[in-house]
C-alpha cells in the first residue's frame, strides 16, 4: 500500500514538520493579539481601543507571514509542496492546492486588513510584493525543469500563490497612502485569482490523476500520443492549461489582467521608489506568464501529442465517466469564471469594500458586466465575451477560407521524410529537450538539489 513506500513516508513526515512550523507561528500571532486584548475573540482583536503597539504590530506581521506563508507555499517556505503533491492521491492534491493553501490567503487578509484595522506602513505591502514576485518567478522556473506531472503542478501552485500576493501587496501599498479604490482593486484581483486558481489547479490535478490511472506513471517523458486514446481527458486538461497560462477567454486571464492593472496604476503613488517598483513587479509577472505558457506547452504537447513513448502510453484508455464528470465541471467553471466576471466581481466587492472602505464593483464592471476595467475605463478595459466571439469568428473565417481555397482539391497524405529511416518515438522532441534552452538562459538560478 501507499503508506509503506519510503517516498510517501518521507513526504508525509516533511509535510507534518512544515505544517506544524506554520501552525506554531500562527498561534504565536494570535497570542500576541490575545496578550494585548485579554481575549481570544476576533471581535476583541479588531477593537479600535485595543490596537497593538507599533513594535508588536511589526512582529505580528512577520509571524503571520511566516505562519500562513508556510501553509500557502511562499518561497522559501514552499519546500514541502513538491514533496507532498506527488505523494498524495490526485484528488487529495486537488483539494490541497485548490482549497487548503487558499485558507492561508484568507488568514493573511484577516490579520492585516481586519485584526490590524487596515493600518500598516508601506513596507508591509512591499514585503508581500517582493515575496510574491520571487515566488511567482522561481515557482514557474522550477516547474519548467520538472518532468513529474504532479511535481510540475506543485511548483505552479507556488507561482500562483505569488501572483495572488502581488495583488494583495499592491492593495496594501495603495491602502497605506489612502488610495482606497486602488487598494480595493488590488485586493479584489488577488481574491479573484484565488478562486480561479482553485478551479484550474484542481482540474489539472484531476487530469494528472487520470493520466496516472491510465498509464501507471507520472513521468511526462513516458507519455505521448494520449489525445487519441484519452480525448475527453485531453480536452479538459487543455482547458486547464490555457487557464493557468492566462490566455483569453478563460478565468486565469481575467484575474491576472486585473493584477497587472493594479500594478500599472502605481503612477498615482506619492513616492518615486514605489512608482518604479510596482512596474518592475509587473515586468516580472509578464516574464512569469511567458514561462508558464512555455511550461504548459511542454506539459500538454509532450503528454498528449506525437507518438506514445512507452508501453504504458500505447495501452492507455480513457478513464471512466465518474472521473470525467469532475473534470468536466471544473473545465466549465474555468470558462464561466472567465466569460462572466459580472457574476464574481460583485461578490468579491462585498468582501473588499468593508476592508478597504471603497466599493468598486460598478467601476470595475462596465456595460452591464461585458467590459472589465481597473476602476476607470479611461485607463484600460477588456471584454472576455467579445474576445471569445472574436476568437471563434477568426477560427470560423479561417476554416471557411481554407475550404474555399481548397475546393476541388484532393487531400493527399504522405509520411514525413526521415532521411531514409523509419521514425520512432525515440526521435521525438522530449520534455527535457524542450526545457533545455530555458535552463541554459537561467543556469545561475538552477542548482543541483542536495538531499540530506
Locate the predicted segments by residue:
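Hydrophobic transmembrane alpha-helices and their helix-loop junctions in integral membrane proteins
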Residues: 1-319
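Cytoplasmic/organellar membrane-interface segments at the starts of transmembrane helices
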Residues: 4, 221-237, 288-440
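Alpha-helical transmembrane segments and their membrane-interface junctions
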Residues: 243-258, 333-351, 448
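Extended, non-catalytic scaffold segments that flank or surround catalytic motifs
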Residues: 269, 412, 428-429, 450-452
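Short, non-transmembrane cytosolic segments of multipass membrane proteins
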Residues: 438-452
Amino acid at each position: 500500500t501507499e503508506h509503506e513506500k519510503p517516498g510517501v513516508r518521507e513526504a508525509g513526515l516533511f509535510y507534518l514538520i512544515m505544517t506544524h512550523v506554520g501552525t506554531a507561528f500562527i498561534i504565536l500571532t494570535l497570542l500576541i493579539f490575545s496578550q494585548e486584548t485579554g481575549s481570544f475573540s476576533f471581535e476583541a482583536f479588531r477593537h479600535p481601543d485595543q490596537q497593538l503597539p507599533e513594535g508588536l504590530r511589526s512582529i505580528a506581521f512577520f509571524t503571520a507571514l511566516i505562519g500562513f506563508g508556510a501553509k500557502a507555499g511562499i518561497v522559501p517556505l514552499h519546500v514541502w509542496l513538491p514533496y507532498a503533491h506527488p505523494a498524495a492521491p490526485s484528488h487529495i492534491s486537488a483539494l490541497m492546492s485548490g482549497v487548503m493553501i487558499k485558507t492561508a490567503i484568507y488568514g493573511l487578509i484577516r490579520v492585516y486588513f481586519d485584526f490590524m484595522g487596515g493600518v500598516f506602513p508601506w513596507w508591509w505591502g512591499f514585503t508581500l510584493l517582493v515575496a510574491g514576485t520571487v515566488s511567482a518567478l522561481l515557482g514557474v522556473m522550477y516547474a519548467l525543469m520538472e518532468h513529474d506531472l504532479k511535481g510540475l503542478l506543485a511548483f505552479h501552485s507556488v507561482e500562483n500563490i505569488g501572483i495572488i500576493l502581488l495583488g494583495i501587496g499592491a492593495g496594501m501599498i495603495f491602502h497605506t497612502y489612502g488610495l482606497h479604490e486602488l487598494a480595493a482593486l488590488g485586493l479584489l484581483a488577488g481574491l479573484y485569482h484565488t478562486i480561479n486558481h482553485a478551479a484550474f489547479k484542481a482540474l489539472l490535478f484531476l487530469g494528472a490523476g487520470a493520466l496516472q490511472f491510465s498509464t501507471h506513471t507520472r513521468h511526462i517523458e513516458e507519455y505521448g500520443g494520449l489525445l487519441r486514446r484519452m480525448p475527453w481527458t485531453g480536452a479538459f486538461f487543455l482547458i486547464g492549461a490555457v487557464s493557468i497560462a492566462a490566455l483569453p477567454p478563460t478565468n486565469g486571464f481575467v484575474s491576472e489582467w486585473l493584477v497587472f492593472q493594479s500594478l500599472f496604476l502605481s503612477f498615482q503613488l506619492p513616492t518615486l521608489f514605489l512608482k518604479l517598483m510596482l512596474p518592475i513587479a509587473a515586468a516580472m509577472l509578464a516574464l512569469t506568464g511567458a514561462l508558464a505558457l512555455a511550461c504548459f506547452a511542454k506539459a500538454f504537447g509532450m503528454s498528449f501529442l506525437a507518438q506514445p513513448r512507452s508501453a504504458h502510453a500505447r495501452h492507455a484508455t480513457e478513464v471512466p465517466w465518474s472521473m470525467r464528470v469532475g473534470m468536466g465541471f471544473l473545465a466549465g467553471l474555468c470558462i464561466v469564471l472567465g466569460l462572466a466576471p459580472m457574476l464574481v466581481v460583485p461578490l468579491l466587492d462585498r468582501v473588499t469594500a468593508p476592508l478597504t472602505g471603497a466599493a468598486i464593483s460598478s467601476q470595475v464592471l462596465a456595460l452591464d458586466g461585458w467590459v472589465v476595467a481597473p476602476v476607470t475605463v479611461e485607463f484600460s478595459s477588456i471584454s472576455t465575451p467579445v474576445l471569445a466571439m472574436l476568437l471563434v469568428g477568426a477560427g470560423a473565417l479561417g476554416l471557411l477560407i481554407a475550404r474555399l481555397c481548397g475546393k476541388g482539391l484532393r487531400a493527399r497524405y504522405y509520411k514525413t521524410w526521415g532521411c531514409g529511416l523509419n521514425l520512432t518515438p525515440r526521435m521525438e522532441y522530449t520534455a527535457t529537450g524542450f526545457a533545455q534552452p530555458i535552463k541554459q538562459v537561467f543556469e545561475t538560478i538552477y542548482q543541483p538539489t542536495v538531499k540530506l
